[in-house]
């Protein structure tokens, strides 16, 4: 299994590279990598605008540069999926840092080809994609969206309810980062 960490965004709302913001003296991106590492054989971090800066702090993952990062998040999903072809995947944005182990274990115990965690009826990350789905995903045009791809494969989707608010907590703004630092233990 391959963990794909999406780190190709521009952090427009945060106005700084949010993935390099530190909690417990570690950049957020490192927390995300450490969250999924125990469950995968390798981690692929898909970078974009902040490639050089991220390369300086990522030591325990393969790095793939998405030359199309300005085309949006799905372009990074595609870059990661191409690097993971032939493998099952755990897909997670780089700013979702503190998903608990039980949530990931629940995803891995599921039975369908696409497994999405849900907390109080709201879906989140990471998303599990079976290798058969990854093979279909890489055929999608770069203008697509992951939610549209998943909708086309609705009969293969399993929503797995978890008791984990962190599946939905991403850091989009400095206020989110401050909330993470204050309220959440990493």
Language-model regions: role of each:
Residues 141-186:
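Conserved alpha/beta core of the MobA/IspD/sugar-nucleotide pyrophosphorylase nucleotidyltransferase superfamily
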Residues 3-5, 44-45, 90-91:
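Structural beta-sheet core signal
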């Amino acid at each position: 299994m391959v963990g794909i960490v999406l780190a190709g965004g521009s952090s427009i709302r945060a106005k700084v590279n949010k993935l390099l913001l530190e909690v417990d003296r570690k950049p957020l991106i490192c927390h995300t990598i450490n969250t999924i590492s125990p469950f995968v054989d390798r981690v692929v971090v898909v970078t974009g605008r902040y490639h050089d800066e991220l390369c300086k702090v990522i030591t325990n993952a393969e790095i793939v540069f998405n030359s199309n990062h300005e085309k949006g998040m799905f372009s990074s999903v595609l870059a990661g999926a191409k690097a993971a072809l032939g493998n099952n995947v755990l897909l997670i944005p780089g700013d979702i840092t503190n998903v608990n182990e039980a949530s990931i274990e629940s995803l891995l115990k599921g039975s369908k080809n696409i497994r999405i965690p849900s907390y109080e009826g709201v879906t989140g990350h990471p998303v599990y994609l079976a290798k058969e789905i990854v093979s279909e995903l890489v055929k999608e045009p770069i203008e697509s969206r992951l939610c549209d791809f998943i909708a086309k494969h609705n009969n293969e989707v399993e929503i797995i309810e978890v008791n984990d608010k962190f599946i939905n907590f991403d850091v989009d703004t400095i206020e989110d980062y401050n909330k993470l630092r204050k309220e959440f233990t990493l």
